Amino acid sequence: MSQHATKKRKLDRSTEDYMYFDSYSDVTIHEEMIADTVRTNTYRMGIFKNSKSIEGKVVLDVGAGTGVLSLFCAQAGARKVYAVEASSIADQAVKIVKLNQMEDRIEVIKSTLETIELAEKVDVIVSEWMGYALLHESMLNSVIFARDKWLKPGGLILPSRADLYIAPINDVVVEGRLDFWSTVKGQYGVDMSCMTDFARKCIMNKDITVNPVTVEDVLSHPCKFAELDLNTVTLEQLRDVNGSFSCVCFGSSSIHAFCVWFTVTFPAEEKALVLSTSPFKAETHWKQAVLYLDDAVDVMQDTKVEGEISLYPSEENSRHICIRVDYVIGEQKKHSKSFSIPDQYLEVK
């Protein structure tokens, strides 16, 4: 996929892993995740709704962090839970497990998933593997590895499915920032309107921006462009998760960007449980991934926005995601733009 990215320094895998696991060694990220009530409550409910499949069974928690999901599984009746966590937060997980008197049922393993050896196959895999735009951090790769090596035939994966969505959006904040430069003369007597183009290039750049998007900013119904079945998806398929989209605008506005989000689904006997990061639902710590066009495009009621979108690993750091969008808005010609996680996240600390 060399056509997708500008060539930069490629990090070796050990450096990628060090950066990734080191980022989970501080309390801040765990506070953010556990304080996300949508995330944590949905996982708790998803686990308890599958208690019949968990009770008396063996569970593998991939990327266990503080061990909260392992504890939910133990509370749901699991006989044994292997909580695998490679970062130093595993030391805190051991303390939390002990504090909750679950040492006899939860074993915290401080190691990468790919290097562990378990005494037995597992009945259930649970993992909170999702990153920004679903695939950032590529933790799903470890879940697939665990599935292929450790999960019994017919075993359960929680969550079991993921879906990706896209929609065009308006951004009044960006609009205001661009308009600002035309107001400077009226305020200070100095014309700085020539800064508008420079500001546009700086703001509407090639970064994947993680921001909350309000319902009012979304200009069409969401369009699902990809679905991942965790029981069958392969590592090869994750090298390029792609799909097409076709949206119809609600009314007159300006498209500044595309917005990408995801859902994951927990199976249940009656009604499946969905964890959604949609702008139409309560905000989560994942927010939404915003992909800015080079220039805003004016649209009217029923203007069609069509195209293809592809998510793939960065050539410089395989744990980081890149996104390419090829799109046509109304009668305009086809445009293409590639996006990546900002450079500061690629640097070794």
From Swiss-Prot:
Gene3D superfamilies: Hnrnp arginine n-methyltransferase1, Vaccinia Virus protein VP39. Its main location: nucleus. Pfam families: PrmA, PRMT_C. Residues 17-324 form the SAM-dependent MTase PRMT-type domain. Its EC number is 2.1.1.319. It is found in: Nucleus. The active site is at 128, 137. S-adenosyl-L-methionine binds at residues 30, 39, 63, 85, 114. It is an enzyme of class 2 (transferase). GO terms for biological process: chromatin remodeling; DNA repair; methylation; negative regulation of DNA-templated transcription; negative regulation of ubiquitin-dependent protein catabolic process; regulation of DNA-templated transcription. GO terms for cellular component: nucleus. GO terms for molecular function: histone binding; histone H2AR3 methyltransferase activity; histone H3R2 methyltransferase activity; histone H4R3 methyltransferase activity; histone methyltransferase activity; protein-arginine N-methyltransferase activity; protein-arginine omega-N asymmetric methyltransferase activity; protein-arginine omega-N monomethyltransferase activity. Keywords: Chromatin regulator, DNA damage, DNA repair, Methylation, Methyltransferase, Nucleus, Repressor, S-adenosyl-L-methionine, Transcription, Transcription regulation, Transferase. It catalyses: L-arginyl-[protein] + 2 S-adenosyl-L-methionine = N(omega),N(omega)-dimethyl-L-arginyl-[protein] + 2 S-adenosyl-L-homocysteine + 2 H(+). InterPro entries: Arg_MeTrfase, PRMT_dom, SAM-dependent_MTases_sf. Arginine methyltransferase that can catalyze the formation of both omega-N monomethylarginine (MMA) and asymmetrical dimethylarginine (aDMA), with a strong preference for the formation of aDMA. Preferentially methylates arginyl residues present in a glycine and arginine-rich domain and displays preference for monomethylated substrates. Specifically mediates the asymmetric dimethylation of histone H3 'Arg-2' to form H3R2me2a. H3R2me2a represents a specific tag for epigenetic transcriptional repression and is mutually exclusive with methylation on histone H3 'Lys-4' (H3K4me2 and H3K4me3). PANTHER family: PROTEIN ARGININE N-METHYLTRANSFERASE (PTHR11006), PROTEIN ARGININE N-METHYLTRANSFERASE 6 (PTHR11006:SF73). Belongs to the class I-like SAM-binding methyltransferase superfamily. Protein arginine N-methyltransferase family. PRMT6 subfamily. This is Protein arginine N-methyltransferase 6. It comes from Danio rerio.
